[in-house]
Amino acid sequence: SNPRIGEAFTRLLRALAEGTIDPHEQNTTVNCFLGEDECMSAYRAAEALTSADQPEEALQILTNAVAKLEETGHFADNETTVYRVFDSYAARLVYNQVKAGTLPAPQDCTILQDKGKETQLAPDSYAFCLFELAYLLYSRDHIDEAIRYAKKAITIAPTMSAGYRALGRIFVFNDDFANARATLESALTLMTSPDDIAALYYHLAYALWKSGDPETALASYIKALQTSNVVSAACVSEIEELQKDTGLPLPLSEDIDRLLDEARVPLVPTESMRAVLEEAAITALDEGLFDIARVLLSFVFRYRNDDALVGVLRSLETSLF
């Protein structure tokens, strides 16, 4: 009943009949069935062009690829179905829980609009193109278009941090600190990956600093450092600059959560988020879905250092190899 599936089978059978692919080569067979990913090709080409200092050409390639995909209507939301992108089992789990109303989310969370609809997957490359478009448009001062693509990216990939970070950055550099803070704090409540959480605290810290709240900004920078080292170099550099500008001392590590809480900055992951991850990991174990259980438990372990969890994780890793 799905025309795209029919086209895929026709393409694969024709290639097999003509002998243009080897049926024993799994990757070749899968790629033939899926067809050419024009968005991924455009994304890679745009990366190369951006590195070669040709941003206008990169913009054109990405814009054309996204427009071509959207013209097909294959991944257009409708009254019964939405198309979304996820980068991990945990991200999909959070989406499902928010959509079902069993995990709290901000009132402006785009996931809430998906209630009652079937969720199907869109290509990852579609989201990557939207992220890159938002960044390139912002860097070329096409602010309104950059905001539009960043918001579209958030809708398509609501549990990935890149769209929120792009939108937050655009707001900050247009001195719209209220919207920057709201965007980044909303994103924090939906993330499970320590790297994503750290990156969001880092971007939030900069927004807080430039909005005139350097004390909370310092706490947010340190929270990012406590969470992951993915943005450590940038955090240290900006902390030094902030202290040079303001003369503020570093807050004590044990005071960070209190300072953020007093400033109404979300402390994540919340207990409810941790409980959802742990319960899902146990369910996956019971069902024999060991790969999924390992991924979920690895997140739980990052936030709850438990010797028993170490043993379970090691056992799972052994069973997978």
What kind of region is each of these model predictions?
Residues I5-F9, L13-P23, D87-K115, D175-A182, ...:
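Alpha-helical linker/edge segments of TPR/alpha-solenoid repeat scaffolds
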Residues D37-M40, R44, E132, A166, ...:
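"A position-specific structural signal for the A-helix of alpha-solenoid helical repeats
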Residues E47, Y135, R169, H203-W209, ...:
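Residue-level recognition of tetratricopeptide repeat
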Residues F75, C129, G163, I197-L200, ...:
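TPR alpha-solenoid repeat register
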